[in-house]
């Protein structure tokens, strides 16, 4: 049992951290304040291959494994959660399923430009009445000759209105229940695709969250991902990886909050000493560090299992659950350690909390 990252993953982490510190972090506060989408940051990431880290080189990616991708999302999230979410959704929810289930023509036509960062991808799963109950999908795709005619609505679609392609879950066989759901590749500029106003959120302001509408949208039947009726099984597998990604985001944000709280506690003086020297503060920092390490290794283990083709559904869910809740607790304590300043935008901890 070896808990150390090997030299290859250490090198990946160093490169990802350098990019996050040099390119992403300087823009993070402005992105959060204005809500603008950071195309400059995303394009810079694409130039370094960071939009296709776990995708083989033959399809425009880096050819690294899932753990390397986890390290990327962790480092990006510590600098800017919006940037991390954008890339996590693009790669994990669009590139990866195309790699797993797409045929060769689909990989060449869609996966390669996505992995190269020539366009962004989105995954249209959630609907107004089908959130956690994804099997309740009402969007339909009716075959008409050599085309599918798609009608329906998707909500909470990350990257939706800025994507070049959307993988859409739709009912292709109404009589088959969950086995009648299929995944279909839909170009975002296809006739019949439209977008509502992007949703305003409490945090992650630089991440685009869209409502997507399909009205008699026609796409070739060749855009079916895998076989008819495999959509539910496919997105269950994909969401396992997505949960690891959310866990990695949580770890990255929590790490940034802990670092900020530690640094502030070492600088701030009250009653003639650093506040870090007060036992109440040191206990808080100790709890934060312990929860962070526990979360990190749950996430890494889930990624490790996935890379080896071992069952990881439960482990991915555990990692997401614990890491996300640990991040909330850590960020909350970071604000408390900052006192009144923690509530202001002068310090980054309020952004980490959101």
Residues covered by each model-derived region:
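Glycine-rich phosphate/pyrophosphate-binding beta-alpha loops
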Residues: 81, 131, 155-161, 204, ...
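Active-site-adjacent elements of ketosynthase-type condensing enzymes
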Residues: 129-140
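Alpha-helical interface subdomain recognition
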Residues: 1-89, 101-106, 113, 117, ...
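Short beta-strand-to-turn element immediately C-terminal to the catalytic PLP-Schiff-base lysine
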Residues: 100-102, 142, 168-172, 185-187, ...
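A short, Trp-centered hydrophobic/proline-enriched beta-strand micro-motif
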Residues: 117-125
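Short glycine/proline-enriched turns and hinge-like loops at secondary-structure junctions
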Residues: 64-65, 133-135, 159-164, 177-180, ...
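Flexible, small-/acidic-enriched active-site or ligand-binding loops
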Residues: 136-138, 189-220
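A short core secondary-structure module
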Residues: 147, 151-195
């Amino acid at each position: 049992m070896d808990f150390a990252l090997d030299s290859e993953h250490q090198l990946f982490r160093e490169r990802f951290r350098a990019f996050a510190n040099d390119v992403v972090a300087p823009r993070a506060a402005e992105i959060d304040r204005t809500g603008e989408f950071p195309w400059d940051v995303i394009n810079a990431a694409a130039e370094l291959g960071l939009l296709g880290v776990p995708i083989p080189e033959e399809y425009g990616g880096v050819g690294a494994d899932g753990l390397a991708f986890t390290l990327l999302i962790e480092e990006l999230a510590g600098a800017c959660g919006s940037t991390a979410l954008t890339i996590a959704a693009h790669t994990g929810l669009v590139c990866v399923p195309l790699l797993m289930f797409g045929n060769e023509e689909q990989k060449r036509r869609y996966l390669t430009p996505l992995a190269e960062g020539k366009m962004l991808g989105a995954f249209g799963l959630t609907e107004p009445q089908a959130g956690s109950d994804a099997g309740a999908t009402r969007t339909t795709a009716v075959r008409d000759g050599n085309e599918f005619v798609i009608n329906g609505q998707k909500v909470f679609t990350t990257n939706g209105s800025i994507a070049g392609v959307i993988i859409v879950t739709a009912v292709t066989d109404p009589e088959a229940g969950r086995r009648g759901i299929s995944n279909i590749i839909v170009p975002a500029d296809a006739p019949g695709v439209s977008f509502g106003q992007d949703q305003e959120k409490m945090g992650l302001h630089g991440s685009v969250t869209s409502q997507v509408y399909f009205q008699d949208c026609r796409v070739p039947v060749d855009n079916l991902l895998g076989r008819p009726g495999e959509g539910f099984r496919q997105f269950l597998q994909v969401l396992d990886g997505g949960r690891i990604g959310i866990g990695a985001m949580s770890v990255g944000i929590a790490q940034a909050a802990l670092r900020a709280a530690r640094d502030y506690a070492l600088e701030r003086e009250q009653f003639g000493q650093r506040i870090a020297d007060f036992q109440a503060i040191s206990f808080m920092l100790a709890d934060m560090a312990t929860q962070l390490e526990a979360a990190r290794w749950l996430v890494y283990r889930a990624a490790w299992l996935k890379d080896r083709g071992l069952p990881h559904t439960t482990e991915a869910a555990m990692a997401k659950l614990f890491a996300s809740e640990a991040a909330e607790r850590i960020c909350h304590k970071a604000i408390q350690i900052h006192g009144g300043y923690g509530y202001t935008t002068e310090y980054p901890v309020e952004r980490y909390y959101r």
